[in-house]
Amino acid sequence: MVALVKPHGADELTPLYVADEDARVALQREAETLPSVVISSSAAANAVMMAAGYFTPLTGYMNKADMLSVADNLTTADGLFWPVPILNMLKDVSAIAGAKRIALRDPNVEGEPVIAVMDVAAIEEATDAELEAVAEKVFSTTDKQHPGVANFLAAGNFIVSGDIQVLNYSYFADDFPDTFRTAVSIRNEFVERGWNNVVAFQTRNPMHRAHEELCRMAQEALNADGILIHMLLGKLKAGDIPADVRDASIRKMVDVYFPPNTVMITGYGFDMLYAGPREAVLHAVFRQNCGCSHLIVGRDHAGVGDYYGAFDAQTIFQEKVPAGALEIKIFEADHTAYSKKLDRVVMMRDVPDHTKDDFVLLSGTKVREMLGQGIAPPPEFSRPEVAQILMDYYQALDAGK
């Protein structure tokens, strides 16, 4: 009997996608008659996550009171534990002023089709000072060089809140038909496979040897039935490797180096926030909604630059997440690297006798340089099959310059 962890804040998932085809067609027809507005990429990604059940139990976009409460207390105004405001922020609301029901248009799909219909609860204005205070709490900085802060502060001062009905999954279902999955379908597949105890690995990058072994370590330590490799498919910062390349490299690694039927490779439709500790908690919330019992949280999880301490994304679970707020557990990981002494990948904290020279360590910049020149990183760092896919990508990129 499979008994998965319960969804967050609910007995069942609450996906906001209109699954009934007749109802969806009728809603689409209605949408074309409604006042409409093109929303931000971030707001569209929020709609996709709500559509797919990942953001259970939310029924729509948060209001200003929720935004301020989540930023200050990690709870919505009515007390639901939630780490990051889920917002529809606009610069201009003249097209929807006074409207009670509106159509939301997708900026990421050609022709800007309607992605959702919204019952408008409120249109509220936040001051620049209020938004900066929220950024400070959520991102731990107001520095506009931080990509998440830059996006948040550029989104607009109007907060449009209310329940939504979602018509589609934006570009994710079409562009990533084999990888994009809803929380509903992931949870159902766990049941079909008989997996009770599942460890999730979050990634926005290709997976090298250290990541591969980290998944194995977690699976063995937790006696997990399987691993969910769950990759972000939405927008990243400039210079990050696109989702289709990451997808291909991860699939190759799993095909060659993991036993059959022990790993599920899936993706979710969200734009990276780079919110470090707060985003790590959000990752835990929606992996619980998928049915995962554990989430691997390592060094610099969901971070960028030097904005966060190496283990801030772990300590937030002890310091800011109340007991009982989440059912999912965290598998705390240190940096993993190949030990020349032991001839295997280890967690660096487990080998206090090692010096830096005892590990195969390469910076991201160095790896990018090598791949661009057609030089494979050492096999202790990256599997040759993975390195080949990445070399092909970087060389094509350089050739196109």
Swiss-Prot record:
Catalytic reaction annotation: sulfate + ATP + H(+) = adenosine 5'-phosphosulfate + diphosphate
Entry-linked NCBIfam families: PRK04149.1, sopT
Family the entry assigns: Belongs to the sulfate adenylyltransferase family.
Pfam family, one: PUA_2
Keywords: ATP-binding, Nucleotide-binding, Nucleotidyltransferase, Transferase
InterPro entries reported for this sequence: ATP-Sase_PUA-like_dom, PUA-like_sf, Rossmann-like_a/b/a_fold, SO4_adenylyltransferase_pro, Sulfurylase_cat_dom, Sulphate_adenylyltransferase
EC number: 2.7.7.4
Record's protein name: Sulfate adenylyltransferase
UniProt pathway annotation: Sulfur metabolism; hydrogen sulfide biosynthesis; sulfite from sulfate: step 1/3
GO molecular function, one term: sulfate adenylyltransferase (ATP) activity
GO terms for biological process, alphabetical: hydrogen sulfide biosynthetic process; sulfate assimilation
